[in-house]
């Protein structure tokens, strides 16, 4: 689906900043009462000046002598004492979500460090990300916002494995590297796997980086070395599909001021699959739906039903597939026994047969396969139905 983007409508308004300030004025004094802390540190895109108005990250920093200890319990204790409603989420350390007039605030415990090398968990280096971006992005804040919006609009935003896109931090690094939104899109048109960007020159070349990081961390089409941590590829989760989608949309926007994204409204025959997923943690649930969808697509195509395109609605636990047909009948080999085992029974059923090199008999039969057969294979499927033109 082609569309003309309006980036301005996604930028935060004056009232968004006013609400954010009120939220911080409310929650920070409470968090500052947490026992044993070093300080409370506003981080994320809000601190960097690249905020899009959706949520705010607050880091509660503890002295590094607390490395190895459960520092999350001190934050939870403070939230309880001050009657702050919260949701506890599990990660390398437990962290917390609360809401202020609909604005989501994430409260993350980290260690106050002098160097990223001292980290206990990846979240500990977030403070260095903030410092690096603030130092280098001056004058390019809106450009970074535009590139984030660009990726959100074409569904290539988000570094979670099930999304396979670019993180906000990756968008900021790329904006800084190319010195602006338009220059970045022009630079993207020259991309071919593997793109190697090492803005702080931690490595002399891509070969050295791959040898140091290993194949798993450098399997993505874009190797974007973290400016503050040479052991990380910030674009490690970027899929080749989304890499290509970013390149294609850079061309479309620069030449025609339009964007394109895969949309179920383009599907002539749309098969809706609803999943029964009991997992409550969003990341795990969505990753499971993504894996199941890919397995189903492969299973359908293996059985002769071509899938032209598909998309996933994680909020509704649904996948939408554009398939060639509802069912298909194909000729397939039906394997029988060796000629010296139960030959009579096989010939009673099949008067035409062939013999393999190993002596086993086989015949050719017509096999009918329906899209509805996948429900027998994947018990996680709750329902299957066609939403528009039911194919024949």
UniProtKB/Swiss-Prot annotation:
InterPro entries per record: CAA_C, CCA-adding_arc, CCA_tRNA_nucleotrans_2, NT_2-5OAS_ClassI-CCAase, NT_sf, NuclTrfase_I-like_C, Polymerase_NTP_transf_dom, tRNA_NucTransf2
Binding, Mg(2+): 55, 57, 106
Quaternary assembly: Homodimer.
Keywords: ATP-binding, Magnesium, Metal-binding, Nucleotide-binding, Nucleotidyltransferase, RNA repair, RNA-binding, Transferase, tRNA processing
CDD domains registered for this protein in UniProt: NT_2-5OAS_ClassI-CCAase (cd05400)
Binding, ATP: 45, 48, 129, 148, 157
Cofactor: Mg(2+)
Full protein name: CCA-adding enzyme
The organism's taxonomic lineage, starting at the top: Archaea, Nanobdellota, Candidatus Nanoarchaeia, Nanoarchaeales, Nanoarchaeaceae
Protein family according to the UniProt entry: Belongs to the tRNA nucleotidyltransferase/poly(A) polymerase family. Archaeal CCA-adding enzyme subfamily.
Job description of the protein: Catalyzes the addition and repair of the essential 3'-terminal CCA sequence in tRNAs without using a nucleic acid template. Adds these three nucleotides in the order of C, C, and A to the tRNA nucleotide-73, using CTP and ATP as substrates and producing inorganic pyrophosphate. tRNA 3'-terminal CCA addition is required both for tRNA processing and repair. Also involved in tRNA surveillance by mediating tandem CCA addition to generate a CCACCA at the 3' terminus of unstable tRNAs. While stable tRNAs receive only 3'-terminal CCA, unstable tRNAs are marked with CCACCA and rapidly degraded.
Gene3D superfamilies in alphabetical order: Beta Polymerase, domain 2, CCA tRNA nucleotidyltransferase, domain 2, Poly(A) polymerase predicted RNA binding domain
Extra remark beyond the main annotation: A single active site specifically recognizes both ATP and CTP and is responsible for their addition.
Top-rank EC class of the record's enzyme: transferase
Keyword Isomerase on entry: no
Catalytic activity from the UniProt record: a tRNA precursor + 2 CTP + ATP = a tRNA with a 3' CCA end + 3 diphosphate; a tRNA with a 3' CCA end + 2 CTP + ATP = a tRNA with a 3' CCACCA end + 3 diphosphate
Keyword field contains Nucleotide-binding: yes
One Pfam family from the record: tRNA_NucTransf2
């Amino acid at each position: 689906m082609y569309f003309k983007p309006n980036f301005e409508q996604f930028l935060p308004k004056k009232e968004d900043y006013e609400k954010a300030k009120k939220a911080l004025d409310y929650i920070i004094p409470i968090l500052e009462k947490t026992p044993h802390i070093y300080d409370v540190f506003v981080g994320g895109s809000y601190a960097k000046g690249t905020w899009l108005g959706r949520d705010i990250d607050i880091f509660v920093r503890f002295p590094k002598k607390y490395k190895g200890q459960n520092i999350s319990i001190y934050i939870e204790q403070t939230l309880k004492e001050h009657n702050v409603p919260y949701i506890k989420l599990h990660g390398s350390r437990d962290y917390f979500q609360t809401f202020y007039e609909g604005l989501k605030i994430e409260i993350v415990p980290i260690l106050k460090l002098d160097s990223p090398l001292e980290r206990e968990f990846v979240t500990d280096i977030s403070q260095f990300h903030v410092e690096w971006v603030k130092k280098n992005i001056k004058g390019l804040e809106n450009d970074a916002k535009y590139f984030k919006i660009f990726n959100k609009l074409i569904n290539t935003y988000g570094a979670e494995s099930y999304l396979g896109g670019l993180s906000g931090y990756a968008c900021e690094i790329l904006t800084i590297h190319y010195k602006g939104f338009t220059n970045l899109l022009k630079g993207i048109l020259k991309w071919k796997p593997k793109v190697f960007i090492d803005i702080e020159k931690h490595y002399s070349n891509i070969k050295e980086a791959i040898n140091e990081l290993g194949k798993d961390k450098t399997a993505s089409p874009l190797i974007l070395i973290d400016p503050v941590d040479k052991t990380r590829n910030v674009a490690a989760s970027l899929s080749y599909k989304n890499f290509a989608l970013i390149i294609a949309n850079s061309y479309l926007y620069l030449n025609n001021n339009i964007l394109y994204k895969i949309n179920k409204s383009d599907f002539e025959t749309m098969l809706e699959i609803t999943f029964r997923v009991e997992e409550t943690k969003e990341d795990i649930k969505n990753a499971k739906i993504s894996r199941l969808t890919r397995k189903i697509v492969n299973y359908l195509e293996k059985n002769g039903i071509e899938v032209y395109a598909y998309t996933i609605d994680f909020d509704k636990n649904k996948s939408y597939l554009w398939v060639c047909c509802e069912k298909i009948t194909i000729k397939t080999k039906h394997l029988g026994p060796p000629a010296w085992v139960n030959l009579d029974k096989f010939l009673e059923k099949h008067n035409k047969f062939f013999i393999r090199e190993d002596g086993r008999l086989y015949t050719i039969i017509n096999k009918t396969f329906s899209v509805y057969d996948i429900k027998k294979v994947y018990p996680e499927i709750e329902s299957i139905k066609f939403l528009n033109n039911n194919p024949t």
